[in-house]
Amino acid sequence: MNFYTDDISNGYNWKGLERSIARMMAHLGWNDINVIGGAGDKGGDVLATRIDGGQIKSWVVQSKAVTGNRYIGPQALNEAIAALSFYETNVAVVATNGEFTGTARHRQEQLLTSGYTLKLWNGIFLRNLIERMPEDHAGLRQLRKYQKDIVEKVVASFDAGDKRAFYIVATGLGKTVIAATIAKQLWAKGCRKILVLCHATDLALQLEQGFWPQITKEVPTSVFFDGLPPRNTEGISFGLYQSLYGYLPGIDPEQFDVVIVDEAHHALAHGFRTCLEHLKPKFLVGMTATPWRGDGQSLTTIFGYPIAKVSLVDGMAMGYLSRVDYRILCDNVDWDNMQSISTQNLSIRDLNRRLFLPQRDEAVIRELKNAMQEISSPKIAIFSPSIEHSNRFADMLSASGIPCAALSKVEKAERRRRLLAFASGNYQAVCAVDVMNEGIDIPDVNILVFLRATHSRRIFVQQLGRGLRLSEGKEKVIVLDFVSDIRRMAEMIEMNNEGKTKGAENEIVYLQEGFVSFSDARVESFVNVWLEDVADLSDSDDEVKLKFPEGF
């Protein structure tokens, strides 16, 4: 038994064929796997990269499912070459569960003669290769101590007859690796129908791919969205609560042995909660990187109290996240105006408007170029305040000699093309408003630029986490925060103080020097005095009235 199941090999599950090809490639060592098949895919179904001769080569795969005695002709090869051109990849592949016609083979020879690298993978090739593959994935990760501890606690809770478990692990510290290992161990205990729920299609696909390295090839996986229900077969199903919601009346509450909820802070939404109240699994697992909700509701009502919490600061202290050089660039504070506004009873919104001068893009680019001098092979992610600014700033960066792609409000295929080009090194920077918050994983990012003042701690931590993942050759991540919100300053000072005083459990490493620096020391003093009276300033609403500390 393996993930290349009969419905896939017989051509009745074309989406399953796409993902099986992607899983096979990931299992054998391809990287940056992205399943892209669907409307507007420009002829590509799977994107990936692979090191070849010391160079990163990008691949695009056109997947063709056939039933009965049908064959794949040369048109599929032409579509694959069109995809190669659109996504600007080095290699194109046409893969099928069936066989190719003689004219398709002849067309391949013509294209090879013309300089294209085009490979044909037929059904026999796929089946034989998957059967001969090792049971374990090439990217199987050995668990770190804190990950192993969480897995052991969750599995022990299951063995003790408990019905639920909940853990909080910050972005970049492997919460999906933990969940996949839990699923693997519960599978071995007879839990053969596992449901993984989330709130977004891209996240469901990323979760499925995130599970692959930790599970053996015998465990089938599938996804459901676009209004389709989960499959009632053995395996791990990944999908959206929105799709599940419409099918609840026809789903046996005990259909699934285990239900795992990712980004659990979404679970209190009405539809999500209704799904979880309907389902009666043997065990419910909740996980999140960012437990805060804007409406103040608590996740403990569904998942219970967390059995473990590992914060960003914990991860940095243990050395499992990149070393951070966080620079709060507050040269835009209007100190000249401070005296005139210090006697007024201002809201946070009004204070931000009066305290911070507009930041010029040219000054931001100068500061960014200075930071790039300190990093070998700079890879930059920029968070803009608006789509209009994102597009304009990407153009300005490119014109200044830093190739940059805007990611917000572009067609999905084009965004994937740009992300692949970024992963392959064709762009040095990407610029977005919010599409990098969830479901995007770019470990090589070593410079983050914040031009946007988010009022959500959860979103801010997700954005910060984009640059914290470790990767080969990455010495540190420089964060340039062109702050324009007093709450952001408070957030970072609190995190910095935590880093100085709190080591992670069972660890003796501390961030005694902190990791945050201010371009103007007066700002840190200003916010620290304020924090004495406003302990929760970082979570305060726009309309909260503030009183200036004396002396400012």
Positions of PLM-derived features:
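Post-DEXD/H (motif II) to motif III coupling segment of the RecA-like Helicase ATP-binding lobe
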Residues: H265-R327
